[in-house]
């Protein structure tokens, strides 16, 4: 049985049905904008939610538990450093269950330097699919691990802030944080 992510823009499997995951661990942290929920499976970060308590649905084979030390503790520490302007890169094991196209988009997003932004069109060109700016935007809207996979660094071709899973207030906050 698969574990499912519920987001405002749809649902999709958090981990493949073939994966053996008996427990997820969840922790909620405070930030200047609002609370964030971080979720791990085994020793990998699998999701970040801008709406704590909204992201996951337990199944008979998977239970959500309070965090163990390990990846969530490290993720919280690194996120706090990031919010204080002391960290520009994360070193957390990430785990996603995405299509090849979505994975290629997110892999390229990981290469965008801290403090820089690029357009959806430029990102489409970088992945070798120049006509796919809208598909790139759709893939970014399904990023299960925002901030750690910095999709907030992608903006409209005209420089405007557009779509972000956490909302435009979060996107603006993160871009401003990185520009200072």
Spans of model-derived segments:
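Short Lys/Arg-enriched helix C-cap and helix-to-coil transition segments
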Residues: 147-154
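…primarily DNA-binding HTH/wHTH and HhH modules…
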Residues: 157-180
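Basic nucleic-acid-binding alpha-helical/helix-turn surface characteristic of O6-alkylguanine DNA
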Residues: 2-131, 177-180
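Regulatory, non-catalytic segments
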Residues: 134-143
């Amino acid at each position: 049985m698969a574990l499912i992510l519920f987001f405002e823009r749809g649902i999709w499997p958090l981990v493949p049905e073939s994966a053996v995951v008996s427990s997820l661990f969840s922790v909620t942290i405070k930030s200047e904008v609002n609370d964030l929920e971080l979720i791990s499976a085994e020793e990998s970060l699998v999701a970040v939610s801008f709406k704590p308590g909204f992201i996951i649905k337990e199944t008979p084979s998977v239970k959500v538990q309070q965090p163990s030390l390990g990846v969530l503790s490290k993720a919280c520490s690194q996120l706090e450093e990031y919010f204080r302007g002391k960290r520009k890169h994360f070193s957390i094991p990430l785990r996603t269950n995405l299509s090849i196209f979505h994975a290629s988009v997110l892999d390229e997003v990981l290469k965008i330097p801290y403090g820089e932004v690029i357009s959806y069109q430029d990102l489409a060109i970088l992945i070798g699919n120049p006509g796919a700016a809208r598909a790139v935007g759709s893939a970014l809207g399904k990023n299960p691990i925002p901030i750690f996979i910095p999709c907030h660094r992608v903006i409209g071709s005209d420089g405007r802030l557009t779509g972000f899973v956490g909302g435009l207030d979060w996107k603006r906050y993160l871009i401003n944080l990185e520009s200072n």
